[in-house]
Amino acid sequence: MKEKISEKEYKALIRKTGKEHFDGEKEEYGDGTVGVWTYELRKYKLKPPVKVKYVTQEQFQEYKDSNNQRLIKIENKVDKLVEIVQIHGEQIKAQGETLQLILQTLQKMSDRLDKMEKRIDKLESK
């Protein structure tokens, strides 16, 4: 994998070797240099700059379309999940209301039993 070297490292390499040395196939790099980096770079454990890659408008449109399709699928899944969560929320709310009614009924029954108990106590004490 090719990585960019800093301008400082490049200038240090030029000073050490005394010349700019390239050979082999011509490749264009992001910093405008051309050539395959050779012995000097390996000697000083430097890595050549990353090659610049260009894409055509058609390739970009294909990439954009595929991304849009992927995003649409994700949006649809999210919409379905939101609907499911809303349904569950409504069910939980309904269950909560039912529990409230049950608790109120139990409270009323408890109050009635307390009143009956007081009456029984009064009758027994007579």
Swiss-Prot record:
It comes from the Bacteria. The lineage of its organism: Bacteria, Bacillati, Mycoplasmatota, Mycoplasmoidales, Mycoplasmoidaceae. It comes from Mycoplasma pneumoniae (strain ATCC 29342 / M129 / Subtype 1). Pfam families: DUF16. This is UPF0134 protein MPN_504. Belongs to the UPF0134 family.
